[in-house]
């Protein structure tokens, strides 16, 4: 199946978007409907390292995690929860491990659903194992194991299928260290999109075959890397104005999953999901202030603005004063959702949405671009050339630059360092050709010679 490209927006304007409501809600798991008028907490966790020593230890660890979460949700009176299991390498390299974990988790979830009526679903995020020690091996021997991991998990209890895919990462790592804007465009917007179409066409087939949900991807490997290198307001390893361009380019790349059959909810660490929601109308999971257990960011309230599920990134399972980590963080997420759901019920959702957005809007260029009104503009620039993976990524990057420039003329403060990086990036973008074939040929020649670990055959070249 060829990907069906988006050439129009799902919403007539940005103000139509809010949290807990999507154009195309998703039914999943045990009586859960996502994006259907209420927000849902989605707890994300990691086993302790020693639990990976054997399959039996790993299953026991996930049984404890699942029981702790379900018990706490019922104990405090929350009506719904999604559990996200991000695979450790052993679970994807050995698909039966992931499958047995999924089965063990779902058995516990069914018990709590049957006894207490709590609505719930299980997401499994398969590890992108398509690499060897030296370089990515996206279409090699590991691809069949990668797909088998999806299929076995889907057959054994997972409701939502996701991955944080790595396509383009080898060129991105080279480009981001050199402030190479064409390299960011090529790695995320072009190589990433090519790989996404391959894998999400196959994942969506598995979901259809198994009666599960092809949920979505995230550009964690690239846009989040740029965000992390950028750091906070004291850091100068990477200009935040470059990190935000990487984020804008990641939106058309993450969009490909939905063009190839995914239906949401998009995965939590895709900060670009607000743009994807504006284009597709599909439900999205977001993370922000509740992901401080895993990393800091500069837009912790703002990203709640239009979420359908609200997540915490990931937390290692261990004890805290208030219970285990998964109990503490799932309760925090659920209280945030209770507030959003009350706002929806009392028709104050847009007031709360705008307060969350305004609290971070001018903190950083990354927050400014992801404010829902500006994110909508980036979406419009993408669908304008929706059939061309190069032009739509280039459009997103240039529109991002325009938005930040407009912000800097107002309340958004940029240092000289950030301002110069933005001007240089925009000049580099405007110097690029409009012809996709020329851009792709030029980049293939350049990065094939400069990046030793870049294997064009990974992308069908």
Curated annotation (Swiss-Prot):
Binding-site list for Zn(2+): 164, 220, 269
Catalytic activity: Co(I)-[methanol-specific corrinoid protein] + methanol + H(+) = methyl-Co(III)-[methanol-specific corrinoid protein] + H2O
Enzyme Commission number(s): 2.1.1.90
Gene encoding the protein: mtaB
Broad enzyme group: transferase
Subunit structure: Heterotetramer, composed of 2 MtaB and 2 MtaC subunits.
Keyword Zinc: yes
The protein's name: Methanol--corrinoid protein co-methyltransferase
């Amino acid at each position: 199946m060829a990907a069906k490209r988006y050439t129009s927006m799902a919403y007539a304007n940005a103000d139509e978007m809010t949290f807990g409501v999507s154009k195309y809600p998703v039914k999943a798991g045990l009586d859960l409907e996502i994006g259907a008028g209420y927000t849902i907490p989605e707890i994300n966790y990691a086993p302790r390292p020693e639990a990976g020593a054997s399959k039996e230890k790993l299953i026991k660890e996930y049984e404890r995690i699942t029981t702790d979460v379900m018990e706490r949700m019922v104990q405090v009176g929350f009506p719904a929860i999604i559990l996200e299991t991000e695979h450790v390498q052993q679970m994807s390299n050995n698909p039966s491990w992931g499958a047995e974990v999924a089965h063990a988790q779902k058995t516990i979830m069914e018990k709590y659903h049957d006894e207490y009526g709590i609505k719930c679903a299980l997401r499994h995020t398969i590890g992108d194992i398509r690499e060897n020690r030296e370089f990515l091996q996206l279409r090699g021997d590991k691809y069949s194991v990668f797909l088998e991991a999806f299929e076995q998990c889907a057959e054994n209890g997972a409701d939502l299928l996701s991955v944080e895919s790595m396509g383009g990462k080898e060129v991105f790592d080279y480009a981001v260290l050199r402030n190479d804007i064409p390299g960011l465009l090529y790695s995320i917007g072009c190589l990433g999109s090519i790989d996404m179409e391959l894998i999400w066409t196959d994942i969506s087939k598995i979901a259809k075959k198994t009666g599960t949900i092809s949920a979505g991807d995230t550009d964690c490997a690239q846009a989040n890397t740029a965000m992390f290198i950028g750091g906070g307001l004291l850091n100068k390893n990477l200009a935040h104005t470059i990190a935000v361009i990487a984020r804008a380019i990641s939106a058309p790349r993450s969009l490909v999953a939905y063009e190839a059959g995914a239906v949401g909810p998009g995965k939590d660490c895709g900060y670009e999901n607000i743009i994807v929601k504006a284009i597709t109308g599909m439900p999205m999971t977001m993370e922000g202030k509740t992901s401080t257990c895993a990393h800091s960011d500069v837009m912790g309230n703002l990203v709640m603005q239009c979420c359908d599920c609200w997540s915490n990134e990931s937390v290692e399972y261990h004890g805290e004063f208030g219970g285990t980590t998964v109990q503490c963080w799932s309760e925090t997420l659920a209280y945030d959702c209770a507030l959003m759901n009350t706002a929806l019920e009392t028709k104050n959702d847009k007031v709360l949405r705008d307060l969350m957005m305004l609290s971070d809007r001018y903190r950083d260029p990354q927050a400014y671009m992801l404010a829902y009104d500006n994110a909508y503009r980036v979406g419009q620039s993408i669908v304008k050339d929706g059939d061309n993976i190069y032009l739509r990524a280039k459009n997103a990057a240039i529109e991002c630059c325009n938005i930040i420039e407009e912000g800097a003329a107002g309340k958004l403060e940029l240092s000289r360092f950030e301002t110069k990086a933005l001007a240089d990036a925009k000049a580099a973008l405007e110097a690029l050709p409009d012809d996709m074939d020329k851009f792709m040929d030029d980049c293939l020649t350049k990065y094939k010679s400069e990046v030793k670990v870049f294997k064009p055959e990974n992308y069908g070249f």
